[in-house]
């Protein structure tokens, strides 16, 4: 929550990966970053984090990096329009894009809690990877399953299959 509410402490970072930002909250770790760090913003995030929880944050907690913001912002669950395109359709129907050099574009599903920008397609500034099994487990209401039947002219046969859609 603190990372989402304050300005990004990783200045000039071309990627939106929430996991990298959470690494800065791990106890005893001061991860290296190739990007300029706004130390004051980082200290505010750390202070807010300490106020919100008495639990020690560990690297095992990073596995929930996509699920937790998706629970808070289910309308920001996103699926890539096409592989590696960087353009995503959010569950609220809005199309948003990652910046061109954002490594997060390799993921089919994301939670994009920070999306900003005016114009035709807003930009995703903060995102976390989600997997299809995570979505099926934690958000079954977003998965629609139906039977599809398509006639195949080449084989003169009816092909029937189950299709899942987010």
Model-predicted segments: where are they?
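Second RecA-like catalytic domain
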Residues: 1-166
């Amino acid at each position: 929550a603190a990372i989402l509410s304050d300005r990004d402490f990783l200045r000039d970072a071309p990627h939106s990966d929430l996991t990298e930002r959470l690494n800065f909250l791990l106890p005893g770790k001061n991860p290296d970053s190739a990007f300029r760090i706004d130390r004051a913003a980082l200290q505010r995030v750390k202070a807010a984090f300490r106020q919100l929880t008495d639990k020690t944050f560990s690297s095992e907690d990073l596995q929930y990096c996509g699920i937790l913001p998706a629970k808070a912002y289910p309308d920001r669950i996103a699926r890539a329009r096409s592989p590696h395109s960087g353009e995503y359709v959010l569950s609220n129907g809005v199309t948003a894009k990652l910046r061109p050099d954002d490594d997060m574009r390799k993921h089919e599903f994301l939670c994009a809690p920070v999306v900003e920008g005016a114009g035709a397609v807003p930009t995703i500034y903060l995102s976390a990877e989600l997997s299809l099994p995570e979505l099926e487990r934690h958000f079954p209401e977003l998965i629609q399953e139906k039977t599809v039947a398509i006639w195949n002219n080449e084989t003169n046969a009816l092909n029937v299959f189950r299709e899942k859609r987010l």
